[in-house]
């Protein structure tokens, strides 16, 4: 959504992986026309598509009595059509691949809802349901469909909260460890961005060639469900 951040990320990747073929494009995943154009550009540039990773999301923090109708509708639209639009746009190219996969970045909220994020939890559960259904529908076309379920992962938002902390003597490691302990994360820390990325790489690649319809927990053991 932010062209400057996108350009910066692309520049960093090119510097780290000078031999890689990187195409950085911006589109609104809720705009089906933009997504279709994006899919055409990607397919034309690379000559085909083997994998699609859906990673559009945010959270609406509010209890039931503080959640307006607009928030319910937006959360449902973003979580569902943020996947539906890309899948519809890339499906023709994926059907031509011999190693095709679709992987959705979801949240542990899908199976473990929290009261203060009721709309987001419900939308995440709907996405997990749809992802499993897609895995059944697309397996006959040779397309695997899986998800990862994220717990608490280090991010820019957490860094901003750290900068605003009251105890300036706490290091980043101490501050995040305290959060993890309060929330009851068994591994006693937040996840690092590369950890869900590695899970995505596994599920999206032929390393997981016999896996479809799965939801891989990446939460440091924070899950409470069976």
Identify the function of each model-found stretch.
Residues 112, 200-201, 212-226:
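Short C-terminal tail/terminal secondary-structure segment
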Residues 92, 136-137:
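Alpha-helical segment proximal to the catalytic Tyr-Lys
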Residues 107:
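Residue(s) in the substrate-gating loop at a strand-loop-helix junction
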Residues 67, 113-121, 133, 161:
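Active-site loop-to-helix junction immediately N-terminal to the catalytic Tyr of the SDR YXXXK motif
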Residues 53, 139, 144, 211-213:
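Short, small/polar-rich loop/turn modules that mediate ligand/substrate recognition or access, typified
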Residues 87, 123:
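Active-site helix of classical SDR
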Residues 63-64, 71-76, 181:
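Substrate-binding pocket helix/loop in short-chain dehydrogenase/reductase
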């Amino acid at each position: 959504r932010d062209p400057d951040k996108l350009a910066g990320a692309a520049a960093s990747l090119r510097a780290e992986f000078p031999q890689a073929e990187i195409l950085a494009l911006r589109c609104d995943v809720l705009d089906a026309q933009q997504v279709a154009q994006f899919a055409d550009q990607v397919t034309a540039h690379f000559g085909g598509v083997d994998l699609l990773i859906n990673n559009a999301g945010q959270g609406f923090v509010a209890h039931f009595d503080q959640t307006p109708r607009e928030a319910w509708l937006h959360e449902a639209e973003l979580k569902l059509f943020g996947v539906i639009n890309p899948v519809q746009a890339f499906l023709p190219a994926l059907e031509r691949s011999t190693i095709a996969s679709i992987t959705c970045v979801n949240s542990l909220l899908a199976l473990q809802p929290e009261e203060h994020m009721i709309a987001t939890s419900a939308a995440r559960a709907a996405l997990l349901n749809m992802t499993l259904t897609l895995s059944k529908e697309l397996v006959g076309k040779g397309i695997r469909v899986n998800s990862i379920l994220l717990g608490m992962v280090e991010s820019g938002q957490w860094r901003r909260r750290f900068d605003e902390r009251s105890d300036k003597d706490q290091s980043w490691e101490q501050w995040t460890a305290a959060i993890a302990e309060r929330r009851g994360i068994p591994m006693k820390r937040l996840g690092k961005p590369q950890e869900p990325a590695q899970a995505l790489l596994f599920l999206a690649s032929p390393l997981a060639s016999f896996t479809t319809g799965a939801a891989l927990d990446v939460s440091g053991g924070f899950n409470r469900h069976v």
